[in-house]
Design a protein with these regions (language model features):
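Helix-to-loop junction immediately C-terminal to a conserved catalytic motif
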Residues: 54
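ABC ATPase NBD Q-loop/coupling interface
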Residues: 63-80
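Conserved ABC ATPase "signature" region
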Residues: 118-135
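Conserved ABC ATPase signature
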Residues: 140-144, 148
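Conserved catalytic motifs of ABC-family nucleotide-binding domains
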Residues: 161
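Catalytic Walker B motif of ABC-type/P-loop ATPase nucleotide-binding domains
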Residues: 165-168
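Conserved ABC ATPase "signature" C-loop
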Residues: 219-220
Length: 288
């Protein structure tokens, strides 16, 4: 099972003075079970792109295939698609609406026509998946911290049992602790369930640590696509379009240029520390 885009283009306000080409012939395939990051500066097209994945926006031209079927064909079941491809918008906590946490997470399954017992079962499973404490299930969602609200909102999507989870800037507005907790939980969720996770972010540091594949959007086009290590090798090209690679990328490239025998492909502080430690250890062994 996969999501496949074939030459997807999208134009806002076509034929008017406000015409804007938000997506330009974007082609890519996301296999089932992959953890993908989509990154780009404001206006790059990344948010427009993900809203095509569950049919919230319809491409001006091109095809979008989910599980081999073109979602733009007449009679395609869009309702089913939107339950299988769950989209969590920026600041999803603004959509919380029920009197307590458990009721809020039950909202999606209820709209799928499930019984009260089934709704509650799936809601509890979803809250457990995002690491939300059971003692708060009957608390008003509006009394929670920002990070807790974000978890509840994500659980509300998971309760509908999607096969694909799309997260648009899931850490926006959170402090560093809340940001790390959410991303750690998303990574754990991916490892536990094997579901496809698509993470949209503007932070290279975030995506470098968590995703296995990185897609860079620029001016409505797919600019780069590969592993984080492959993408960050193009750090000068990223700089040219207003994006910065993780700080460790610059440090490791500087060390390599100065003659240190280290890999410049480290994408996290931990990887860089290991690389430097191994280099120093080898040098010490040679000197002794």
């Amino acid at each position: 099972m996969s999501i496949k885009l074939e030459n997807i283009s999208y134009v806002y306000s076509p034929g008017t003075a406000y015409e804007h080409h938000a997506l330009k012939n974007v082609s890519l395939e996301i296999p089932q079970g992959q953890f993908v990051g989509i990154i780009g500066h404001t206006g790059s097209g990344k948010s427009t792109l993900i809203q095509h994945l569950n049919g919230l926006m319809k491409a001006t031209s091109g095809k979008l295939l989910y599980e081999g079927q073109n979602i733009y064909e007449d009679g395609y079941d869009m309702k089913k698609l939107r339950t299988q491809v769950g989209l969590v918008f920026q600041y999803p906590e603004y959509q919380l609406c029920e009197v307590d946490v458990l009721s809020d997470v039950c909202f999606g399954p209820q709209n799928q026509g499930l019984s009260k017992e089934e709704c509650e079962k799936q809601a509890r499973e979803a809250l457990k998946l995002v690491g939300f404490p059971e003692k708060y299930y009957k608390q008003s969602p509006f009394e929670l911290s920002g990070g807790q609200k974000r978890r509840v909102a994500i659980a509300g999507i998971l309760a509908m049992h999607p096969k694909v989870l799309v997260l648009d800037e899931p850490t926006a507005g959170l402090d560093p602790k809340g940001r790390d907790e959410i991303l750690d939980q998303v990574k754990l969720l991916h490892e536990k369930t094997g579901m496809t996770v698509i993470l949209v972010s503007h932070s290279m540091e975030d995506v470098a640590k968590y995703v296995e594949r990185l897609i860079v959007m620029n001016d409505g086009e797919k600019m780069l696509d590969g592993t984080p290590e492959e993408v960050f090798r193009h750090y000068k090209e990223l700089e040219a379009v207003g994006l910065a690679a993780p700080q460790v990328t610059y440090v490791m490239h500087d060390l390599k240029e100065k003659g240190f025998d280290v890999s410049a492909d480290a994408t996290t502080v931990e990887e860089a520390a290991d690389e430097i430690y191994n280099f120093l250890k080898k040098r010490q062994e040679v000197q002794s």
